[in-house]
Each structure stands twice: as structure tokens, then as C-alpha cells.
Amino acid sequence: MTAQQALLANASNNIANVNTPGYSRREVDILARIDPVTVDGVLRIGSGVQLGEIRRITNTFLENSLRASGAKQGKASVRNEYLGRVESIFSLSGPQVTVGSALNSFFSSINQVALNPADIDLRLDIMQRGEELVTAIRGAYQEIADTQTELDQRIAQDIDSINATTRDLATLNSGIAQKEATGVSAADERDQRDILLGKLAEKVSFKTLELPNGMINCYLDNGFPLVSEATARRLEVTTNPSFATGPLPPSLNGGILSYVTFNFGSDAAPAHLDLTQTLKNGEGSIAGALQLRGYADTANTSAFEADGELVQMAARIEAIARTLLTSVNQEYLGPDEDPSTAVHEPSAGDLNGNPPSVFGLFDFAFSGTKDADGNGLPSLTDLTSTGIDSFARILSLGFSQPEQFAAGRDSNPTAGVRTIAPGDGRNAQAIAAMRTQTQSFMAGSLTFTGTFDEMYNSSVSTVGSLKSSAQSEYDVARQAFTVTSVKRDEFSSVSLDEEFANVIKFQKAFQASARMIRTAADLLEMITRLL
């Protein structure tokens, strides 16, 4: 009766936890009782039944597969979400003004002025289209940079979550070992530990090793122990790692990208182990965030030298801005009026006959000397000498009045004398022609040779391909996680039909045992009366 009562109690507990997240159904082992005493010649019927151990019905392979698929889904989800946001920046269609549409409008507007240089309305349109282009470039770059900053903050939040989870795992490890050492089942604690392992897998990929005492160690892919028996190692997010030997490279927003580390030292004398690359190359949401945000080597000097898809996208916008500041501005100056001098003398002029400045069509906010070499021509060397890392953030239009646009060129080049015919649109024609001319676009590790349209279309194609791939990866990962979850539940979760059938079976066995005892009692009473 005691055995059947225990079986009924276990079935009741399973039914009560049918909707408990992470609960693995229990089974009670029942064994035939072995009689240690044997008598020769005596028929041995048996000694009844005894209770064995309470077992959690789990499958290690399924549990590991579920965590692995959860980690893949975590990474794919982050990548799909953030790439979906960035994709709209490079859209070829839609109501919003993009860098691509603004470039087309700007060059088309200049082409119109080339046909009628004296028309103030057309010149006003150039100003409007130029401001739209500047706004589009600055806005696109800033949105990418802000996304990088947001991901940096998300990584810090994920690390806080990882630290809390590993701390709880270490506590459960200790409790499980203590309980099982006394022969008491720690099934509930093991269920809670599996839940925490699944939660941890959503953030980061790791391997586990169960020890004979019931504790589990968790290791990162490089072997670093996140949890070692009853000890959890706390990860840190820092922008001042001890392994940096000089100034750290800037982020796209001008700040510092954080590093995920473990401090073997103290707060006063830190000794950081860099785990950022290990986490980035793994799975989980933190891997997806790091792959998008990028990793900056401490030896880098520019935000565009970091890896990461967001850095690649921002570099394309930055390269367009730098080409506008150098190649386009250089063409805007016109041929040199006096090649015999070391300083370029512009042949282009506005409606008042004034020549444009070195950064006359597109400019940038900087209080120091912009023409560092003093040769009168804008160049990448001039930009580099300013110490500014990103010009897309501070790009501006180089003129503020419509008559200041230099549409014509000197009709009779003579040093010190500039004559611009009223209908001369040669300079505007030269600028408009640059739309279809091959340019060299450079920013950080990015180098692209082609026209403005080819550069932008390549950017659209790259971002679209990344988003499509991320969507496919997410769909596959989500489906794999769902299938694995179903398989795990089929093996480990509570089936009400099965438990109800067990209740009926155990109840009948209990009733039969009770009737047997009652029958034995009746027989004993009858024998007593006869005596």
C-alpha cells in the first residue's frame, strides 16, 4: 500500500505541475523486495515491493540541442531586428529622402543650372537640393551611429543578465550537491537549473560538464569557466581595459566601444582578460549584437577600421561625404588660372565673379586650418590633418546665397583678372558630369571604385543581402527551436492522459492491496475465534 500511495502522490504532483515552465515529469522506481534470509526447502513466494528513487525524465541530448538552438535563435533575432532598421536607410523607394535619391536630385538640379546659369530660382533649387543631400548624409550616418551606441548599451545589459544567471547557477549547484549528498532528490532544483541554462544560452554559447557531485561547470568556447561548481565569474564591460597601451579608437559617434572582460586583478589594479572576440564569434544575442556593432582593436585609430556590419555601412556613407569634400570640391574650383604658382587659383566664379573657397561647394565644421598643405586644393590629406574621424557627421553646404554658386568659368584666364560670362554654365556642367564619372571612394578599410550611382547601389545591395540572410537565418533558427522544444516536451513534459491512466492504475492497485490486508485481517479474526 505504501508503494502505491507513493505512486499516486507522484502522479498527483505531475498533474499539479502540468503548466509549470521547465518542469520535467517524475517517475518513481518500484522494485521487488529482496528477502535476505533463505530457508532450504521452503517455497519462496516473495517479500513484496519497495520504493526506489524518484527520477526526472530528461534527455541530455535534447536539452543540449534545445539550448544550442536557443542560442542560434537569440543571435539571429538580434541581427534580423537591427538590420531591418538599417535597411530602410538605404531604401531605393519610399517617401523618405535617402542619400541615393538626394544625390540624384542634387546632380539633376546642377544640370538645370548649367543650362540657365543666371536663373535665381534654379540656383535656389540647388541650395535646397544641396541641403537635402547634406541632411540625408548626416541623418543616415547618425542613425547608423546611434544604432551602434544602442547595441553597445544592449551588450552591457546582456552582460548584467549573464552575471545574474551565472550567480544563480552557482547557488543552485551548491544546493543540488548538498541535497544529493544526503540521498535526497534535488529534482526541483535541477529543473530550475535547466531553466537558467536555457536563459543563459539565449545570451551566449557555452559548453557544460556535469560533475559526479551533481554540479555543472559552464565554459565559454575558448575554455573560460563562467561557472565552476559553486563559483560564478563575473564579467565586466569596460571602456578602459588594462590591455590597452594607448588611446582607444573612437566609435561612430565619437565615444569608445566597450570591451567585455574578466578582471583577474582588483578595481585598483585591474588585469583584464579580453573576451569580446570569443563572445562575438559564438552564438546568442550578445554575439549578434557584437557582430553588428563591431570590435575595435586597441591598435586602431579610426572608427572605420573596426569590423562589424554597422561599421561597413557607416563607412560607405562616410566615403561618399569625403568624395564630395575632395573630388567634387576640387572640380568645383575649376582649372588652375596660373599653373606657374604653387597655389591653385580657381578659374570658376559665381554671379559676382568671386572664386569659390577651397571647400566652396561642400564644407565641414572645423575651427582650425582646413587646407593643411596650403596648395589651394581639397584632398584626403587635408581631411586627415584635421584629426577628425567622421566628416559625414559635420558635413555642410559651402555657400549660403544662390548667387554664390559658381556655375561659370573664366572665359579669358589671366592672373588676377576673372571674367565670367552671364550665360556661362561650364563649371556646373563639369560638376553634373561627375555623377557618371568613376571616383575612388575610401574610408577606413573600405575602398570602392565606381560612379556615385554604382557606389550607392552597391551599398543598397550589400545591406539588402545582409537583411535577407538575417531573415533566413532567423526563420531557420526559430523553426529549429520550435521543433526541438516540441521533441523535448514530448519526452519530458507531463501528459495528462498518461497521468490520469496512471492514477486509475495505481488507485486500483492501492484498493487491491487494501482489500488484501482486510482479507488477511478477517482470516486472522476467524482463526482467533476458532481458538
Segments the model singles out, each with a brief description of its role:
Residues M1-L531:
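Structural signature of extracellular appendage/secretion-system components
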